[in-house]
UniProtKB/Swiss-Prot annotation:
Component of the PEX13-PEX14 docking complex, a translocon channel that specifically mediates the import of peroxisomal cargo proteins bound to PEX5 receptor. The PEX13-PEX14 docking complex forms a large import pore which can be opened to a diameter of about 9 nm. Mechanistically, PEX5 receptor along with cargo proteins associates with the PEX14 subunit of the PEX13-PEX14 docking complex in the cytosol, leading to the insertion of the receptor into the organelle membrane with the concomitant translocation of the cargo into the peroxisome matrix. It comes from Dictyostelium discoideum (Social amoeba). GO terms for biological process: protein import into peroxisome matrix, docking; protein targeting to peroxisome. Residues 1-277 are peroxisomal. It is a single-pass membrane protein. Residues 301-748 are cytoplasmic. Residues 86-104, 510-527, 612-627, 724-748 have a biased composition (Polar residues). Residues 7-30, 122-131, 190-209, 218-228, 409-424, 445-476, 528-542, 569-611, 628-661 have a biased composition (Low complexity). Interacts with PEX13; forming the PEX13-PEX14 docking complex. Interacts with PEX5 (via WxxxF/Y motifs). This is Peroxisomal membrane protein PEX14.
Length: 748
């Protein structure tokens, strides 16, 4: 009864299990689609979470990163049990093998997936199915493709390349990511055929399942035996223990496999990240490529495409613009021609006026040259005549000195004879005090009127003396018969207070100034002359001066006073003629004798002055004229004891000349120059600048015989200035030719 109960229970259990399995399969078929969708979403979330964790780890310090890695490993060690689907139990005979059960291989992931509730297997078939499902993970791989990938990766030429390039190449060849991972694992482990261990495990599990099935059949057949039941229970316990051990071994293998997968996933993710990182080289390359393409397109469109499309319009516009430009240029050319013609006409008019001015200037220059040549010739002639005249004047002065001495002696002798012959007197003269006064002339005239002239004796010679004074500068003195005062030894002009009109020093050089010899030389010469009348001097021709020393203004205030600059020169002519007249008898009159004695005393006191007449000469055209008048009323006769009847006539001419030259200007306006040429040379040697020399021009010679012209240059004279260059430089060649042609036609 016990065995029957057990069998019935087993049958009931099997039926219940089959029913449950059928229900579960239906439910699983409905929920597989939902599970796949959930897995896809969870994988996306896990990828996001992994990226965030990596970013956080990169930002954290290295010590904290190591601590977190250790915690992650500890958390990943407990792994969920593998999902195992129940299978339907079929009735089979004792000699037949159980049919192959459908195996479902769950995809392993890092995250825990919610699984349906699992029931503990009641038979050995469930354990064999679990072990089969665990130990066959590579049923979805294509072994041929995996082996080819392993051979490719083991190639020595490929080992040195980057892993990202290897993975990309294998994916191009058609391998899935799982196959690539499997190939990489086999390359790392060195096992080309990675299914050996799995096959050995599978064979062991199959042998165990067969033994279980055999035992299970025997138990059913021998249910009546209690001993067999006890043995079966013990055997079940042993099988359960072995099964637990196998599960633990499988779990360790699965954990190691999961770790490898995680490491591979991390490597692949890093490679993908490296490929997706931003690189400046690629950015610059792309930017340059875009810019080059854009510039090329712009060039093509602007130069080829647009002109090709708008060819007709552009040609028309260009032709219209060219016509406008040509018309504007023609108008400008016409305007320029008109302006050039106007300027040419204006220039011709200006050149005509300039030509007239140039001709006038040339005429003035020629006149100045002629005047300069005439002045040089006249100056040379006057200098030669002056030198000859000075020599003649000196000779005449010597003759005058001799005559004056002879005349003084003769007057003394005549006075003595008059005193002895009783009332034989001579004419009375007034002294000359430097200024010819009218009172002296009146006195002379009264004396001449009151004088009684005795007839000359026939045996006595008659002496007539005529003195002529000539002033060479043009004067306003009338040609009247006036007596000339005698030559005095002292300076008759000491009482005058005349000075130069300015405070400047005299301009006349030293060699041209008045000599410092006093007029006392004349007295010395008079003393040396012999007082005899028997040897008269040889007659000389009266001299007429032919040069001009001044003008009428040399006399101060328009009066008849003489100037200091005038040099008195006297010329004396003596002629002796025989007289056939009878001597007149002297009249005896006491009154007249007394008067004559007084007159003789006055004559002795006045140094026996002679009767002279002043004749003024006008020197306007460098031709002097000497006009002399003799005063016959002043003739005196004296008896002589000699038998010779001779008459001695002496003519004295006094010429007063001026020391100023013809071309002298006003003395106050001239600049003072040095009086000595040697002083000027010494000043130049010492580096000084004498007066009258310009200092604003630096033309000192250098060592190389060149002259350094400073910035300060002498301003150009009007005839030296070139005023036409500024006008002619702006002319064209045609205008200059037309002007030259007009000049040649005008000259013809």
């Amino acid at each position: 009864m016990d065995n029957d109960d057990i069998n019935n229970n087993n049958n009931n259990n099997n039926n219940n299990n089959n029913n449950n399995n059928s229900q579960e399969l239906d439910q699983q078929e409905q929920t597989q689609e939902e599970i796949t969708k959930q897995r896809i979403q969870k994988r996306k979330e896990e990828a996001k979470r992994i990226m965030e964790e990596r970013k956080k780890r990169e930002q954290q310090p290295p010590s904290q990163r190591q601590y977190e890695d250790v915690e992650d490993d500890q958390q990943q060690q407990p792994i969920r049990p593998i999902k195992q689907l129940p299978q339907r139990q079929q009735q089979y005979d004792d000699n037949d093998e159980p049919p192959q059960q459908q195996q479902y291989e769950p995809k392993i992931s890092q995250r825990k997936v919610p699984l349906p509730p699992m029931k503990q297997p009641t038979t050995s078939s469930t354990a064999s199915a679990a072990t089969g499902s665990i130990l066959s993970p590579s049923s979805n791989f294509r072994e041929d493709m995996v082996k080819k990938a392993v051979l490719f990766l083991n190639n020595p030429n490929v080992k040195n390349t980057a892993l990202a390039r290897k993975v990309a190449y294998l994916e191009k060849k058609g391998l899935t990511s799982d196959e690539v991972k499997e190939a990489l694992k086999r390359v790392e482990t060195g096992n080309i055929n990675g299914s050996s261990t799995n096959n050995s495990n599978i064979t062991q599990s199959n042998s165990i399942s067969r033994t279980r099935n055999d035992n299970y059949g025997n138990n059913n057949n021998n249910s009546s035996n209690n001993n067999n039941n006890i043995q079966q229970q013990q055997y079940y316990q042993q099988q359960q223990q072995q099964h637990q051990q196998q599960q633990q071994m499988a779990l360790t293998q699965i954990q190691s496999y999961q770790k490898r997968l995680e490491a591979d996933d991390q490597r692949i993710a890093q490679l993908m990240m490296n490929n997706n990182r931003f690189s400046w080289n690629s950015f610059l390359f792309s930017v340059t490529a875009i810019v080059g393409a854009a510039s090329g397109l712009a060039y093509l469109t602007s130069n080829y495409i647009i002109p090709f499309l708008n060819g007709g319009k552009t040609n028309k516009d260009a032709s219209a613009n060219m016509d406008k430009k040509i018309t504007s240029l023609q108008e400008e050319i016409i305007k320029l021609q008109s302006t050039i013609i106007q300027q040419g006409n204006d220039f011709r008019e200006s050149t005509k006026s300039l030509k007239t001015l140039i001709e006038q200037q040339q005429q003035q220059i020629l006149q100045q040259q002629q005047i300069n040549s005439v002045s040089t010739t006249t100056n040379s002639a006057t200098s030669a005549s002056n030198s000859s005249e000075i020599v003649e004047i000196k000779k005449e002065l010597k003759n005058l000195i001799n005559l004056i001495g002879n005349k003084e002696n003769s007057n003394n002798s005549n006075n003595n004879s008059n005193n002895s012959n009783n009332n034989n007197g001579y004419s009375k003269y007034n002294g000359f005090n430097g200024v010819y006064n009218k009172s002296s002339y009146d006195d002379v005239s009264t004396n001449n009127n009151n004088k009684t002239n005795s007839p000359p004796s026939p045996n006595k010679p008659t002496t007539t003396t005529t003195t002529t004074a000539t002033s060479t500068p043009g004067s306003n003195i009338s040609n009247t018969n006036k007596t000339l005062p005698p030559i005095i030894k002292t300076n008759p002009y000491s009482h005058l207070s005349w000075k130069l009109p300015t405070d400047q020093p005299p301009v006349i050089p030293s060699w041209q100034q008045k000599s410092s010899n006093p007029p006392s030389d004349l007295s010395n010469a008079n003393d040396k002359s012999s007082p005899s009348n028997s040897n008269p001097s040889t007659p000389t021709k009266p001299y007429q001066s032919s040069f001009n020393y001044g003008d009428v203004n040399s006399f101060v205030g328009g009066s008849n006073t003489l100037n200091f600059d005038e040099k008195p020169t006297t010329t004396t002519t003596t002629s002796t003629t025989p007289s056939n007249e009878r001597p007149s008898s002297p009249s005896v009159n006491n009154n007249n004798n007394n008067n004559n004695n007084n007159n003789n005393n006055n004559n002795n006191n006045n140094n026996n002055n002679n009767n002279t007449t002043i004749a003024s000469t006008s020197n306007e055209s460098n031709n002097s004229k000497v006009e002399t008048t003799s005063n016959d009323s002043d003739k005196s006769t004296s008896p002589s004891s000699s038998s010779n009847n001779t008459t001695s006539t002496t003519a004295t001419t006094t010429t007063i000349t001026s020391a100023s030259t013809e071309d002298n200007k006003q003395q106050s306006d001239e600049t003072p120059y040095s009086s000595d040429f040697l002083d000027v040379i010494n000043q130049l040697k010492q580096g000084k600048t004498p007066p009258g020399i310009r200092t604003d021009i630096d033309d000192k010679p250098l060592e190389n015989s060149t002259v350094t012209k400073s910035a300060k240059e002498r301003p150009k004279k009007p005839w030296e200035r070139d005023t036409l260059t500024s006008v002619t430089n702006n002319l064209s060649v045609e205008e200059t030719q037309t002007i030259n042609n007009t000049d040649s036609s005008v000259e013809k």
